[in-house]
Swiss-Prot record:
Lineage of source species: Bacteria, Pseudomonadati, Pseudomonadota, Gammaproteobacteria, Enterobacterales
Protein's UniProt name: Murein tetrapeptide carboxypeptidase
Single GO term (MF): muramoyltetrapeptide carboxypeptidase activity
Gene name of the record: ldcA
Known role: Releases the terminal D-alanine residue from the cytoplasmic tetrapeptide recycling product L-Ala-gamma-D-Glu-meso-Dap-D-Ala. Can also cleave D-Ala from murein derivatives containing the tetrapeptide, i.e. MurNAc-tetrapeptide, UDP-MurNAc-tetrapeptide, GlcNAc-MurNAc-tetrapeptide, and GlcNAc-anhMurNAc-tetrapeptide. Does not act on murein sacculi or cross-linked muropeptides. The tripeptides produced by the LcdA reaction can then be reused as peptidoglycan building blocks; LcdA is thereby involved in murein recycling.
Any one GO biological process: regulation of cell shape
CDD domains: Peptidase_S66 (cd07025)
The protein's annotated pathway: Cell wall biogenesis; peptidoglycan recycling
Signal peptide interval: none
This protein's record includes keyword Hydrolase: yes
Enzymatic reactions: N-acetyl-D-glucosaminyl-N-acetylmuramoyl-L-alanyl-meso-2,6-diaminoheptanedioyl-D-alanine + H2O = N-acetyl-D-glucosaminyl-N-acetylmuramoyl-L-alanyl-meso-2,6-diaminoheptanedioate + D-alanine
């Protein structure tokens, strides 16, 4: 089975019971879980001091265990504080041989983008310990797609997407929309041309989602892509004031401005049902009336 190494570079794990349940679930399945002490750390709202959380990341360069999955405990906020002090060069060098399979999402997007920007390091945007593996019930779809991505050099995700018929390919990248916005103009924002940009978010009203997407558009980032895929935007329920304005309104407005396909409906993000995507891998997108396919390759996988 697999070895999981936990890291907690972001928010304090307020759901300790869920973290313990996630660890138990993984060990019951025959996996080994290391570095479990990080789940109890706390400094204000963070999972430890800056020094402790930074060491979670920088110590990965010295990790010698083979075939290791690095799993973020949870998101929240905190990764942005660490970006300037991460030893990117050491992490990039470490990933050039026997790469760690680094997985997380939400606030962790900042770390993932930094690794991609600094050294084309591929990481996995997917489930985390508390919200997913520690849920009351582990979602079967999420579990299946996690192992699908980590065990197969080439794999395909299928869904019923909304958007124009298209077939294109490029570097798959993205993650949490708000975190990408926070990286614009910094050394940790990947400079991807002709890519396939995939985005998700949580607790953002539709107008805020639109505003962030427009910022990516006006910054020239969206027009430089081959396609955009939108995942889930949890907690984005409109109110009476919106008078019918919703996420579909956002999508329609963006499509009226973009000359590239925008495909929606992917189960990707903060919901219990989510795929796992290797950010920085090669992807082929095919959208027809029959459905949508995303075939991904070129990412590191577990050695079976």
């Amino acid at each position: 089975m697999s070895l999981f190494h936990l890291i907690a570079p972001s928010g304090y794990c307020i759901k300790q019971h869920a973290a313990l349940r996630g660890i138990q679930r993984l060990t019951d399945a025959g996996h080994q879980v290391n570095n479990v002490e990080v789940i109890a750390r706390r400094c204000e709202r963070f999972a430890g001091t800056e020094t402790e959380r930074l060491e979670d990341l920088n110590s990965l360069a010295r990790l010698t265990t083979p075939n290791t999955i690095v799993l973020s405990v949870r998101g929240g906020y905190g990764a942005s504080r660490l970006l300037a002090d991460i030893d990117w060069q050491a992490l990039v060098a470490r990933q050039q041989h026997d790469p760690l399979l680094i997985c997380g999402h939400s606030d962790f997007t900042a770390i993932q983008c930094g690794l991609l920007a600094q050294g084309n390091v591929i990481t996995f945007s997917g489930p985390m310990l508390v919200a997913n593996f520690g849920a009351d019930e582990l979602n079967a779809f999420t579990e299946h797609h996690f192992w699908l991505a980590l065990r197969n050099k080439t794999f395909t995700i299928e869904w019923q997407g909304e958007g124009p018929t298209c077939q294109t390919e490029g570097t798959l990248w993205g993650g949490n929309l708000a975190m990408l916005i926070s990286l614009i103009g910094t050394p940790w924002m990947p400079k991807i041309e002709n890519g396939i940009l995939v985005l998700e978010d949580i607790n953002e009203h539709p107008f805020r989602v639109e505003r962030m997407l427009l910022q990516l558009y006006h910054a020239g980032i969206l027009p430089r892509q081959k396609a955009i895929i939108l995942g889930s935007f949890s907690g984005s329920t409109p109110n009476d004031y919106d008078a019918g304005y919703n996420l579909e309104s956002v999508y329609a407005f963006l499509r009226s401005r973009l000359s590239i396909p925008l495909i929606t409906g992917l189960d990707f993000g903060h919901e219990q049902r989510t795929v796992t995507l290797p950010l920085g891998a090669h992807a082929i997108l095919n959208n027809t009336q029959e459905g949508t396919q995303l075939t991904i390759s070129g990412h590191p996988v577990l050695k079976m």
